Amino acid sequence: MSIASVASVFNGDHAVGSQVTVRGWVRTRRDSKAGISFLALYDGSCFDPIQGVIPNNLPNYDDEVLKLTAGCSLVMTGDVVESPGAGQAFELQVTAVEVTGWVDDPDTYPMAAKRHSIEHLRELAHLRPRTNIIGAVARVRNCLSQAIHRFYHEQGFIWVSTPLITASDCEGAGEMFRVSTLDMENLPRTDAGKVDYDKDFFGKESFLTVSGQLNAETYACALSKVYTFGPTFRAENSNTTRHLAEFWMVEPEVAFATLDDAAKLAEDMLKYAFNAVLNERMDDLSFFNERVDKTVIERLQAFVSSDFAQVDYTDAVEILKNCGKKFEFAVEWGIDLQSEHERYLAEEHFKAPVVVKNYPKDIKAFYMRLNDDGKTVAAMDVLAPGIGEIIGGAQREERLDVLDARLAEMELSQEDYWWYRDLRRYGTVPHAGFGLGFERLVSYVTGVNNIRDVIPFPRAPRSASF
């Protein structure tokens, strides 16, 4: 007897006639008049449950098997046989069932075998992994994560753990969560009446990071090719399907790289990750294609076979102004492109993923390299058909005098970024990178359009349960 995952049985890893033990939870049970019960058991290793055919001569058939309901956990042993029914190649002729956990009250079990709205499932985040849709999201999320790590490993990158607590605001937007151990009921004050952060744990104002980029740059300027993959935080009071207060970012940084190098890296990474999902998780993709978005598989296949288009921001604005389409947000040079503009470019004009580059400096961060025209910076956004922006990146400003001028323009303190400026003082080097919002990627791949449904425990305004 061997312990087997449901996926390994379906993959044919166990010969027909061999005895295996599977462990998991009941999806459904139905009983025939012939004295046989059919049990669907899932263990999360793949989308489909395995069917166990249970005869009524088992010693615990009447007392336990006939009382099994959705959610009960058990260990099931049986012989692998070819399934006569459609839908799966193998099933188990069960020889033993051991119940390990009962559902206290099947009538009130929230995950009983009925379809729930995805909004309702959000209120049951501790139980929703048991549903088909959230289980499938979890497997696809894992597949994408593993593929991204594998891609960078194969490309010779070094993974860097950047800090979650920081004193720097990477985006300069100020939308940061403060980290403090001060007594909120009795805050220490300076003579000027301001909060005295010198009395705080770190001796200064500290925050949860909005990006690992600045820290990653320090390692790229020593190790050449690095990336960070971890949680980031934004105190942005946005209740939309596209925003979270806590989300994961993939951020590579490459020394001696240009903006075009970063664009090529982004294209290669996305295609690698999408191919991995198409090759490894077609069972889950088929579910999403059938139940969530009928274009999921076609969209991914088209993406990996497309050449990325490239367009300057200035030219993109002209395309949008002259396309004859009425947008909710007016288009003029100097605006930040809205989702409707991005999707028009990717879906209707180029009909392919597109890299928009060289944005106006006034709408971009201080660290982006100033172009020779003095008006634009070497920044890019990767736009994908079906979602819009999926990656944002830039060549970094490696010239200290220009960086200092940008800090002054944006009224940011040189003192706060002393260590970042040091990189430009000691062996400065051109370098570039980008940020990929991981949940945005999972949403794109699965077709699940609310970003709160592609992360296990979403954190958003007035939402921090579990």
From Swiss-Prot:
PROSITE patterns: AA_TRNA_LIGASE_II
GO molecular function: asparagine-tRNA ligase activity; ATP binding; nucleic acid binding
UniProt gene name: asnS
Organism encoding this protein: Shewanella denitrificans (strain OS217 / ATCC BAA-1090 / DSM 15013)
PANTHER family noted in UniProt: ASPARAGINE--TRNA LIGASE, MITOCHONDRIAL-RELATED (PTHR22594:SF34), ASPARTYL/LYSYL-TRNA SYNTHETASE (PTHR22594)
Major subcellular site: cytoplasm
Domain of life: Bacteria
GO CC terms, sorted: cytoplasm
Localization per record: Cytoplasm
Catalytic reaction annotation: tRNA(Asn) + L-asparagine + ATP = L-asparaginyl-tRNA(Asn) + AMP + diphosphate + H(+)
Keywords recorded for this protein, A-Z: Aminoacyl-tRNA synthetase, ATP-binding, Cytoplasm, Ligase, Nucleotide-binding, Protein biosynthesis
Family, per entry: Belongs to the class-II aminoacyl-tRNA synthetase family.
E.C. code: 6.1.1.22
Protein name: Asparagine--tRNA ligase
Subunit structure, interactors included: Homodimer.
GO terms, biological process: asparaginyl-tRNA aminoacylation
